[in-house]
Regions:
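Short, exposed beta-strand/loop patches in secreted or surface proteins that constitute
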Residues: 18-20, 46
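Beta-strand/loop substructures that line and gate deep hydrophobic ligand-binding cavities in soluble
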Residues: 33-81
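Residue-identity detector for threonine
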Residues: 5, 19, 39, 53, ...
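A conserved amphipathic terminal alpha-helix motif
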Residues: 61-112
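Short beta-edge strand/loop motif at the mouth of beta-sheet-based domains
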Residues: 1-17, 24-26, 97-108
């Protein structure tokens, strides 16, 4: 299955190829890392009890260059932010991304 997603801080569509979905257990996708190759993202979900779930995200397939290492660290920060936003949404019903970025510039409000 192919979908396209976007992010306020990185305007434009990002094509994503979903390669595997195991309900309540795992999602695997591939998307372009830049420079004409894809990375593989694996999201794993493990129940830790009635109200707790451990979520692990890994992204593999990066080339070894400073540019690609920088991109991988940027994506790591993005995945961390996404998980924090999801946790607050699930537990408190608050959308942390709403108002976080100016949709015209992709930057936090007031940033130069």
């Amino acid at each position: 299955m192919r979908i396209a997603t976007g992010f306020a801080d990185f305007p434009g569509a990002f094509p994503v190829k979903v390669t595997k979905v195991e309900p309540n257990r795992r999602i695997v996708l591939e998307w372009e890392a830049g420079e004409g190759y894809d990375t593989r993202v694996e999201m794993e979900f493990e129940s830790l009890g009635k109200d707790d779930t451990l979520v692990k995200i890994s992204e593999s397939g990066w080339r070894v260059s400073q540019k690609d290492l920088d991109r991988s660290y940027g994506n790591c920060m993005g995945w961390t932010q996404m998980l924090c936003c999801c946790k607050v949404w699930v537990e408190h019903g608050l959308n942390l991304r709403e108002g976080f970025f100016d949709t015209r510039t992709g930057k936090p409000p007031g940033a130069e």
